[in-house]
């Protein structure tokens, strides 16, 4: 959150009556209201929703397809009040071709966290299936292929966990102020965090069967768009 706080501190003295402030960075619920809004108010004395407008609109873009998704995806706009949401909607309508839905600040913040946590949990399910299938000596990809023939089943393929700077972090934003322990969200995070090490151990087992092995190994989380998140440092360290 240091970047959000830093950005708010940099703009706080520039805000005037009638201005609109929009936060897009994925943040815990309450960030826009209680951090960004309070920083501006403490510096200027202006009140969000009364003297200036304040909104949150989470980004929904895929690296490698940013411009396309910026225009095409539906957007969720949360305002500190109805007017803030409506003004923000008017701005986004100038370039967004998808639908725009209006809600409050905290709901819009939580929607983004829910999207990424949903993906994290589904990835963890596929990865746990792969670990269990290995115990049984079953090919997990064959299991998934046949299971996905069911019209209401869509299991992802297992892999090296979760890459990028969002999905691995956002689930913790959901949990951090709840005091909840041993949740599905937390267990999913642990499964995905461990997958690079599990894979590197398996690679090491295979490599050790050969004399003087030479290994070049890169795993990318966005291979279709030439956007790489590397686990090479883990694998090379384990194999050295």
Where are these regions (language model features)?
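Structural/interface elements that position substrates and couple domains in central-metabolism enzymes
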Residues: 1-240
């Amino acid at each position: 959150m240091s970047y959000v706080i830093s950005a708010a501190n940099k703009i706080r003295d520039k805000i005037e009556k009638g201005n609109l402030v929009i936060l897009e960075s994925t943040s815990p619920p309450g960030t826009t209201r209680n951090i960004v809004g309070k920083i501006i108010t403490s510096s200027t004395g202006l009140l969000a929703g009364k003297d200036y407008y304040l909104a949150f609109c989470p980004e929904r873009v895929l690296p490698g397809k940013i411009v396309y998704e910026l225009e095409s995806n539906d957007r969720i706009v949360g305002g500190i009040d109805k007017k803030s949401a409506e003004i923000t909607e008017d701005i986004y309508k100038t370039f967004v071709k998808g639908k725009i839905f209006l809600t409050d600040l905290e709901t819009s913040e939580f929607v983004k966290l829910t999207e990424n946590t949903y993906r994290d949990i589904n990835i963890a399910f596929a990865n746990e299936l792969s670990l269990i299938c290995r115990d049984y000596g079953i090919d997990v990809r064959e299991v998934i292929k046949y299971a996905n023939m069911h019209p209401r089943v869509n299991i992802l393929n297992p892999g090296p966990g979760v890459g990028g700077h969002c999905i691995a972090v956002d689930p913790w934003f959901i949990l951090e102020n709840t005091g909840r322990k041993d949740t599905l969200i937390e267990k999913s995070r642990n499964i995905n965090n461990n997958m690079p090490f599990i894979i590197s151990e398996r690679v090491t087992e295979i490599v050790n069967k050969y004399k003087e092995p030479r290994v070049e190994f890169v795993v990318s989380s966005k291979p279709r768009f030439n956007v790489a998140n590397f686990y090479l440092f883990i694998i090379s360290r384990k194999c050295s």
